[in-house]
């Protein structure tokens, strides 16, 4: 081998090596590019319902989501606003109604509320399976596994050992792609019914619509279906009443046409509607929505960790972090924002209290009228006013922050709700007089205890039964879920199992 | 003379000439600078009340001001909203009430309205001199000449031949400097009473406050004074009730403490308050004021004529020129603005109608209760609710565009106003029943004619008298004013002398 050949060889080897390194670098960059631009597959098929499984791919998002655990305060709204127990007499909300807590508590709160009762086995208890619909990524997993009709058939207790992970990743993200998407079919159907072309939904739209899967008005529509064995069953399918539009009056017309009622009022006998939480609907009437702002823009601001930008999943009150939320668009001091929002809240609180007082008094006066022998014909216009007025009131305030999302629409609705309640009371004064009672003063409903007594809520019995349920069937559910690998036992750690009634002393 | 001397001389002459020209140029530039930076003296002393006199210095502003003559449509609000005649029964507004027209018609409308009656000489007629206060730059001229107490003493007809120029230049501009300034002392006093340091008012503040001289709530406070001859007289002094604050509730408290009433309601006998037009007060609760926007920013946008920038004095609806108003700050389409404003108006119209219907029915029911022998003690709480509810209603809608200036405050107030009216009606249903009448239906007030008949308005008599006044005393006033050089006769040219009643056929 001569020297020049050696040099040539060495050069060639170096060149080949360098090319190899370059190719390797190109390949690894291409892999990196793919990784950055493609969400990882958390689970190859179906729905990855355990939030913990998303941690390895989305550690920042997961950690911020877990911060919702800190939003753990129980605020007993029946104690703060006892009128509610009168207004909802005969319905679950008169039993127990708290201000919302973080997403982390969705399962715990659903189990703890006295509204879901104390089942002793999979086929009893007051509530249908539909009551789980918005509580957990186990819901889309189950819908995927058993079908939507089967999911919506049966009692709430049917899925006690299946639905165990609180609202989390797979509620809004596809487990194969990580992309935002609907996990609940009811929203897509409702959007189509209200004229939306699903193919034209943008990413920015989606940053609102994934929230709108749950933060909306809905009802449980009885739907007949036939199972594989040919047996006819009735599913109670979560349905959004959007076919006539999204306003309170549109939905009222929808429900009226369908002769739908949620319950018959225990005191006034009015055929009532219960608004759930039409947050998306009210938001869409407000100035932020009109300017293209999404839910996530304010409730899930972008955050920075080192060089990584991510979305904060500690969904809560944007006022907790004005610098990352309001101030990204508006120029003003934090104080100015707080004062402005406070005055909006104050106005709504005033009109809300006014309407609640009117409606509660009207229900009690209607009860008295029945007691004195009022006729169906006399009472019919009163009951219609009560149904309509209370619906408008409920629609306007049942969702988070309606006073901010759409302050003018909220105030308008509260004004009209109160007017209808007032008109019912004017009629009732005449009906009562007709039956010999002039100037009737309704009984005192100024405390939760007094109001629940008037509403006939057997609170102590409900608590006793709930406690028995929690120490038996609930423990069994959790054990089964852990054993089957559906629940990470760590999820239950450090949960104080708080409720409005855990400190209530029971009389012997 | 040698040649070099000649050259020297010629050079010197040229240099001196050039220096002279330069000095002249410097002087004329200095004069120009002064002229640009100093408003001209329209009149050496006192108030230049004839708007025509300002034309030579401010031709663009004058011409744009004169465009307010085009805003000449008469909208009879008693015809559009007949409830008003019931609500104001016993007070001037039940006689005649139109939507506002351009500043140019301030005098004509004040003379034409049936509210100012038909005086036959300087010391009779229903109204005090105070009713001229906001109508003309002749008012500050007169106050300057006779003193404020003398101005506010006597009947409206006292100044019929003095107050002849419609709202114009000297209402907001100083005749010696052209600067913005208060021409009415009541505003300065009210600002001081509400804690404002007048020395800290900025130019931008002034672009709102000159409007606030008139677009505010006020009342005529009886004030004793002694004239030069030692005679004690009572002036009715325009006073802004701001000492407790600017909200509706603040002012209500002020009036209650002072046991003030504007009139006793003819049907219900309630001691009523009439809101004037608290536009500044409501505006100051809204988002535009909170962001430092002035009245002039939207109602008097800057315009360009060649290289000259001037302020448009054709004060009217900013929606007539969205490009020069809203769009200087906001980015959106004109259509988006129109739709947004329309929905604000719609909400306010709904709650306003609701409250008016409730209040009108309550007044009529109260009238029936008195008729059936209700006692003062029974009626007292009803009358208090009527006074308070109607005040809140009136405060919320009496000014221009409250639905836009402060939509949330307007809706809140309408909701509370309606609630108070409703509570009065509930009490009245019991009082009527107590006096043997159950389920009373109030008489029909669905047209202006029906409502005015219920309110006891002698419309034909009022029109006949007004026509007589206009063909006698009014003509005399105008002749005297022209003769004394206080009125340019051209001002009256082309005025169609429109009113709500000019086309009303009188029965023989």
Curated annotation (Swiss-Prot), chains A, B:
GO molecular function ontology, one term from the record: calcium ion binding
Binding site for substrate: 218, 277
Cofactors demanded by this protein: Ca(2+); heme c
Compositionally biased spans, kind Polar residues: 494-508
Binding site for heme c 4: 295, 298-299, 405
SUPFAM superfamilies for the chain: Multiheme cytochromes
Keywords: Calcium, Electron transport, Heme, Iron, Metal-binding, Oxidoreductase, Periplasm, Signal, Transport
Pathway per the UniProt entry: Nitrogen metabolism; nitrate reduction (assimilation)
Signal sequence segment: 1-23
Function recorded in the entry: Catalyzes the reduction of nitrite to ammonia, consuming six electrons in the process.
Protein name per UniProt: Cytochrome c-552
């Amino acid at each position: 081998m001569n020297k020049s050949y050696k040099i040539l060889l060495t050069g060639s080897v170096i060149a080949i090596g360098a090319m190899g390194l370059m190719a390797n670098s190109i390949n690894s960059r291409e892999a990196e590019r793919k990784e950055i631009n493609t969400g990882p597959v958390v689970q190859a098929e179906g729905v990855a319902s355990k939030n913990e499984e998303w941690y390895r791919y989305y550690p920042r998002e997961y950690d911020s989501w877990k911060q919702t655990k800190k939003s753990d305060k129980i605020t007993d709204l029946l104690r703060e606003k006892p009128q509610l127990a009168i207004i909802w007499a005969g319905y679950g909300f008169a039993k127990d109604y708290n201000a919302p807590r973080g997403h982390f508590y969705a399962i715990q709160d659903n189990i703890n509320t006295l509204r879901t009762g104390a089942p002793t086995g999979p086929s009893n208890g007051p509530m249908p399976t539909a009551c789980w619909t918005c509580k957990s990524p186990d819901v889309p997993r189950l819908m995927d596994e058993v079908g939507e009709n089967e999911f919506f058939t049966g009692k709430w207790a049917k899925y006690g050992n299946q639905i165990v992970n609180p609202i989390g990743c797979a509620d809004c993200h596809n487990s194969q792609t990580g992309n935002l998407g609907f996990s609940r079919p009811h929203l897509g159907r409702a959007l189509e019914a209200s004229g939306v072309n699903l193919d034209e939904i943008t990413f920015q739209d989606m940053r609102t619509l994934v929230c709108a899967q749950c933060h909306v008005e809905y009802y449980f529509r009885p739907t007949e279906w036939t199972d594989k064995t040919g047996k006819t069953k009735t599913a109670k399918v979560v349905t959004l009443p959007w076919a006539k539009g999204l306003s309170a009056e549109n939905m009222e017309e929808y429900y009226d046409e369908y002769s739908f009622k949620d319950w018959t009022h225990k005191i006034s006998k009015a055929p009532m509607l219960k608004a759930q939480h039409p947050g998306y609907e009210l938001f869409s009437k407000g100035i932020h929505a009109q300017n293209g702002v999404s839910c996530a823009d304010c409730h899930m601001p972008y955050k920075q960790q080192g060089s990584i930008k991510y979305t904060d999943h500690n969904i809560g009150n944007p006022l907790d972090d004005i610098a990352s939320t309001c101030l990204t668009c508006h120029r003003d001091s934090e104080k100015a924002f707080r004062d402005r929002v406070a005055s909006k809240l104050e106005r709504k609180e005033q009109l809300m209290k006014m309407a609640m007082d009117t409606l509660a008094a009207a229900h009690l006066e209607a009860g008295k009228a029945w007691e004195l022998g009022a006729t169906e014909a006399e009472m019919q216009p009163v009951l219609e006013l009560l149904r309509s007025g209370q619906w408008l009131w409920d629609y306007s305030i049942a969702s988070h922050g309606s006073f901010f999302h759409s302050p003018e629409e909220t105030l308008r609705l509260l004004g009209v709700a109160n007017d209808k309640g007032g008109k019912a009371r004017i009629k009732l004064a005449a009906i009562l007089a007709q039956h010999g009672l002039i100037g009737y003063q309704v009984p005192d409903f100024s405390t939760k205890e007094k109001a629940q007594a008037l509403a006939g809520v057997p609170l102590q019995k409900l608590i006793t039964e709930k406690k028995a349920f929690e120490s038996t069937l609930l423990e069994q559910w959790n054990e089964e879920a852990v054993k089957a690998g559906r629940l990470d036992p760590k999820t239950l750690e450090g949960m104080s199992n708080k409720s409005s009634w855990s400190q209530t002393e029971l009389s012997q």
